[in-house]
Amino acid sequence: MAWHKPKFIEVSCAMEITRYAPADGDEPILF
């Protein structure tokens, strides 16, 4: 279960970055 917390943090960070990323960025908006 130790890896669950960091995983959640990574996902949250990815979602936050995606939120502020431009729609025409390198990666498509998935969230």
From Swiss-Prot:
InterPro entries the UniProt entry points to: PQQ_synth_PqqA
Q: Does the keyword DNA-binding feature in the UniProt annotation?
A: no
Cystine links in this protein are none
Which Pfam families is this protein grouped with? PqqA
The alphabetized list of GO BP terms reads: pyrroloquinoline quinone biosynthetic process
| TM region(s), chain numbering | none
The location annotated for the cross-link Pyrroloquinoline quinone (Glu-Tyr) is 16-20
Pathway, per record: Cofactor biosynthesis; pyrroloquinoline quinone biosynthesis
Q: Does the record carry Cell membrane as a key word?
A: no
Alphabetized UniProt keyword annotations:
Plasmid, PQQ biosynthesis
Its biological purpose is as follows:
Required for coenzyme pyrroloquinoline quinone (PQQ) biosynthesis. PQQ is probably formed by cross-linking a specific glutamate to a specific tyrosine residue and excising these residues from the peptide.
Family statement = Belongs to the PqqA family.
Name of the featured protein: Coenzyme PQQ synthesis protein A
